[in-house]
C-alpha cells in the first residue's frame, strides 16, 4: 500500500485568510437551491481489506491505495439534482408543432435565444410528441446553448412523452476525420480563451496524490469558491517512464504520448486560501511534482444546465461498421454535448438508434443518471471526456454500442456506477491519458478491443482504474491481457469481479475476492457517506 504523507486537514468551512486586493472578481452564478432534507447517520461498514485499509490510511493522514471518488457528480454528490422552478419557455410559443413532420429547429433556437437574453434560469419545455430538429434542409451544425441555468425539459422519455428526432445525420466537417460530425445539441461556453491566456499562477510546491492543498506563486485574482484548471505535464523521458511504470514505454505505438508528453488536467474548486497555499474542495487525483511546471488557469464555463425527461431518436438503421469511411457510423447521429459545464445534468432520457448518445467534455461535476441507449448499435454511449469528477450512473446500454459508457482523454475522477451494457460490448477507455476511473457495481461484457483509441494515443488507461464488484456477462476470453496492443490498462485495482475472466497477478495492483462480491457493495456510496457522515437521500433514492 502507498504510505506517502498526506496533508489531510479537517474541513473548517470556507475561510479566507489571505485574499488579494482584486478578490472581487466576478464569481460564477450559483446553482439552483435545494431544500435541506434531514438525513440519517450511516451504519458502520465492516468491508473488505481494501476498504479497511482505505479507512485506516484516511484516518492516519496517509496516502490511500483507493482514491476518494466521492466528489463526483452534481454539487460533489452532496445534494441531489434539483427540480427547478424557473420561468418556462414553451417551444410551441415560438412556432414548434409536434408531430407535423416539419422542422422545429427554428422554434427551439428562438426559445433558446429568448431564454439566454433573459439571463438564463429558464426551462425550455417540450410538450408530448415528436419534434424534428434535423430535417433534410437543416444546417450541418449544432444547436448551441450558451448560458447558465438553462434546462431542456420534456414530458417524459417513455411512450406518450417527448421525442426529439434527428431525421438526417450531420456529416463530418473535417476531411477524413471520421468523428468530426457536429452534435445535434451542444451546451457550450462560446468564445473561450486559450489556457495560456487564462493563466493565473504557477505551482511552487509538491503535493501527494490524494491531498487537497497546493503552494502557489501568487493568490492574486483568486477567491473562495472559484473553479480552476490545474495543468501539469512533462515531455521528459523519465516522467513518461514513471507514468507507465512498471512497464516499459512502447515506442512503437505511443507516438502522441511520447511527442506531447505526460498531460494531467484537473478542475478544482478553491475552499480556503492561507498565505500562498490553496486548499481545494476536491482531492488531487494525481501527485504534483513542481519541477514539471504545473500551472493554474481560469476555467471558463457555464453552470446549472440540464436535460431531462426527453427521448432522443436518431435515424440510424444500418449494420454498424467501425470507422466506416463516410463518417456516418462514427459521428453522423451524435445527440448531446456538454462542453465547459459545471454542476449540470442529464437525467431520465432515452437515446434510440443513435451513433453517440452524449459526451461530457472539459467539464466538472456533471451527473448523467437514469438514461438508456436502445435500438440499433452505434459507435459510443455516454462518456466523460477530458473532464473531472463526472458521475455516470444507472445507464443501460441495451444497444451494445461499440464503446459503451466510459472515459476518454484526460478525464479524471470519473465514477461509472450501476451501469449495464450488452454482453457484446465493454466500457470505453479511449486513450489520450484518462486516469482515476471508478467502475462501480456495473455489469456487461468484458471483451478486448472495445476500449477505443488509436494505438498512437495509448495507453488506454493510466493509473487508478478501479473495477469494483463488476459482473461479467456473456462469453469470457479466459485470462484477459491487460497490457497488450489496443488493451493497455495500467495495473488496475480489482475487487469483487464476478465472471469467468481471470487476470494475471503481475498486471493488477490487486485482484481481491475474485468471484465473490466485496463489501461495501457500492464504493462511491460508501466513500460519500464516510465523507459526509450521513446517508445521502438522493443516492439511496436513485433507482
At which residue positions do the language-model features occur?
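Structured core elements
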Residues: 125, 229, 269, 279, ...
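Right-handed parallel beta-helix
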Residues: 149, 154, 226, 232-264, 271, 303-394, ...
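C-terminal motif of bacterial Sec signal peptides marking the signal peptidase cleavage site
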Residues: 15-18
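Gly/Ser/Thr/Ala-enriched C-terminal appendages of enzymes
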Residues: 415-543
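Glycine-rich beta-solenoid repeat tracts in large extracellular/virion proteins
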Residues: 141-146, 159-192, 295-300, 319-322, ...
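Bacterial N-terminal signal peptides that target proteins for export
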Residues: 1-6
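Extracellular "leader-to-stem" segments immediately downstream of a signal peptide or signal-anchor
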Residues: 20-309, 313-324, 493-543
Amino acid at each position: 500500500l502507498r504510505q506517502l504523507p498526506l496533508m489531510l486537514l479537517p474541513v473548517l468551512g470556507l475561510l479566507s485568510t489571505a485574499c488579494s486586493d482584486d478578490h472581487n472578481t466576478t464569481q460564477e452564478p450559483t446553482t439552483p437551491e435545494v431544500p435541506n432534507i434531514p438525513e440519517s447517520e450511516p451504519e458502520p461498514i465492516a468491508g473488505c481489506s481494501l476498504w479497511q485499509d482505505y479507512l485506516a490510511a484516511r484516518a492516519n493522514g496517509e496516502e490511500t491505495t483507493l482514491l476518494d471518488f466521492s466528489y463526483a457528480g452534481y454539487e460533489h454528490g452532496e445534494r441531489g439534482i434539483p427540480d427547478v422552478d424557473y420561468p418556462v419557455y414553451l417551444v410551441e410559443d415560438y412556432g414548434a408543432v409536434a408531430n407535423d413532420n416539419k422542422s422545429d429547429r427554428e422554434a427551439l433556437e428562438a426559445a433558446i435565444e429568448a431564454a439566454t437574453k433573459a439571463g438564463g434560469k429558464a426551462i425550455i419545455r417540450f410538450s408530448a410528441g415528436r419534434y424534428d430538429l434535423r430535417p433534410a434542409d437543416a444546417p450541418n451544425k449544432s444547436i448551441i446553448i450558451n448560458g447558465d441555468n438553462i434546462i431542456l425539459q420534456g414530458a417524459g422519455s417513455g411512450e406518450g412523452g417527448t421525442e426529439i428526432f434527428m431525421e438526417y445525420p450531420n456529416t463530418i466537417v473535417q476531411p477524413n476525420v471520421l468523428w468530426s460530425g457536429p452534435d445535434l445539441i451542444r451546451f457550450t461556453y462560446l468564445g473561450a480563451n486559450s489556457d495560456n491566456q487564462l493563466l493565473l499562477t504557477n505551482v511552487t510546491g509538491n503535493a501527494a496524490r490524494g491531498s487537497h492543498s497546493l503552494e502557489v506563486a501568487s493568490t492574486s485574482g483568486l477567491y473562495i469558491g472559484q473553479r480552476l484548471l490545474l495543468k501539469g505535464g512533462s515531455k521528459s523521458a523519465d516522467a513518461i517512464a514513471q507514468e507507465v511504470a512498471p512497464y516499459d514505454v512502447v515506442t512503437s505505438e505511443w507516438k502522441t504520448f511520447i511527442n506531447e508528453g505526460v498531460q494531467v488536467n484537473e478542475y478544482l474548486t478553491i475552499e480556503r486560501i492561507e498565505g500562498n497555499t490553496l486548499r481545494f474542495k476536491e482531492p488531487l487525483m494525481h501527485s504534483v511534482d513542481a519541477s514539471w511546471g504545473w500551472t493554474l488557469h481560469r476555467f471558463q464555463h457555464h453552470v446549472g444546465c440540464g436535460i431531462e425527461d426527453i427521448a432522443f431518436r436518431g435515424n440510424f438503421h444500418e449494420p454498424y461498421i467501425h470507422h466506416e469511411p463516410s463518417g456516418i457510423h462514427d459521428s453522423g447521429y451524435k445527440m448531446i454535448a456538454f462542453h465547459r459545464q459545471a454542476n449540470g445534468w442529464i437525467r431520465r432520457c432515452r437515446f434510440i438508434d443513435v451513433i453517440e448518445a452524449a459526451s461530457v467534455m472539459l467539464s466538472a461535476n456533471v451527473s448523467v443518471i437514469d438514461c438508456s441507449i436502445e435500438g440499433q448499435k452505434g459507435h459510443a454511449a455516454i462518456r466523460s471526456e477530458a473532464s473531472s469528477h463526472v458521475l455516470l450512473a444507472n445507464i443501460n446500454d441495451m444497444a451494445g454500442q461499440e464503446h459503451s459508457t466510459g472515459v476518454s482523454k484526460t478525464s479524471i475522477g470519473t465514477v461509472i456506477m450501476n451501469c449495464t451494457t450488452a454482453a457484446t460490448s465493454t466500457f470505453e477507455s479511449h486513450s489520450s491519458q484518462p486516469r482515476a476511473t471508478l467502475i462501480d457495481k456495473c455489469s456487461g461484457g468484458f471483451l478486448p478491443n472495445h476500449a477505443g483509441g488509436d494505438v498512437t494515443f495509448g495507453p488506454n488507461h493510466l493509473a487508478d482504474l478501479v473495477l469494483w464488484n463488476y459482473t461479467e456477462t456473456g462469453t469470457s476470453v479466459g485470462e484477459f491481457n491487460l497490457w497488450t496492443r489496443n488493451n493497455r490498462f495500467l495495473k488496475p485495482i480489482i475487487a469483487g469481479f464476478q465472471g469467468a475472466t481471470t487476470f494475471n497477478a503481475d498486471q493488477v495492483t490487486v485482484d481481491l475476492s475474485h468471484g465473490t462480491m466485496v463489501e461495501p457493495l457500492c464504493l462511491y456510496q460508501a466513500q460519500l457517506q464516510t465523507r459526509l457522515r450521513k446517508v445521502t437521500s438522493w443516492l439511496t433514492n436513485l433507482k
